[in-house]
């Protein structure tokens, strides 16, 4: 099986990153925003893996492990905060939360 060309991996990473960014800017639900950030982090990890594979360096894999750790921490904290926000305000819509604050 032939390896995926470097340019194709970067294009895929770019498309995933842009999709995550667009979803982050358009959607106002806190859970969807967290998922969008996860997509963006995975796209960055894919770019690191592709670059490390292209130049034969293990640094891309190390950075991907760092990104996975960061993403797991972000999800844990984000979902915990989201749960508290939902319990207090009964909504996860970021715009409605901004209106409530004044």
UniProtKB/Swiss-Prot annotation:
The chain crosses the membrane at residues 6-26, 30-50, 62-82. GO terms for biological process: ATP synthesis coupled electron transport. GO terms for molecular function: NADH:ubiquinone reductase (non-electrogenic) activity; quinone binding. Its EC number is 7.1.1.-. It is an enzyme of class 7 (translocase). PANTHER family: NADH-UBIQUINONE OXIDOREDUCTASE CHAIN 4L, NADH-UBIQUINONE OXIDOREDUCTASE SUBUNIT ND4L. Belongs to the complex I subunit 4L family. NDH-1 is composed of 14 different subunits. Subunits NuoA, H, J, K, L, M, N constitute the membrane sector of the complex. NDH-1 shuttles electrons from NADH, via FMN and iron-sulfur (Fe-S) centers, to quinones in the respiratory chain. The immediate electron acceptor for the enzyme in this species is believed to be ubiquinone. Couples the redox reaction to proton translocation (for every two electrons transferred, four hydrogen ions are translocated across the cytoplasmic membrane), and thus conserves the redox energy in a proton gradient. This is NADH-quinone oxidoreductase subunit K. It comes from Methylococcus capsulatus (strain ATCC 33009 / NCIMB 11132 / Bath).
């Amino acid at each position: 099986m032939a390896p995926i060309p470097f340019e194709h991996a970067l294009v895929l990473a770019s498309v995933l990153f842009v999709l995550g960014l667009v979803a982050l800017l358009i959607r106002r639900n806190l859970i969807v925003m967290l998922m969008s950030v996860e997509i963006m982090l995975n796209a960055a990890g894919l770019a690191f893996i592709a670059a490390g594979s292209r130049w034969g360096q293990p640094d891309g894999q190390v950075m991907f492990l760092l990104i996975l750790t960061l993403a797991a921490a972000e999800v844990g904290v984000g979902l915990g905060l989201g749960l508290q926000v939902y319990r207090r305000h009964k909504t996860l819509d970021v715009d409605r939360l901004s209106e409530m604050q004044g």
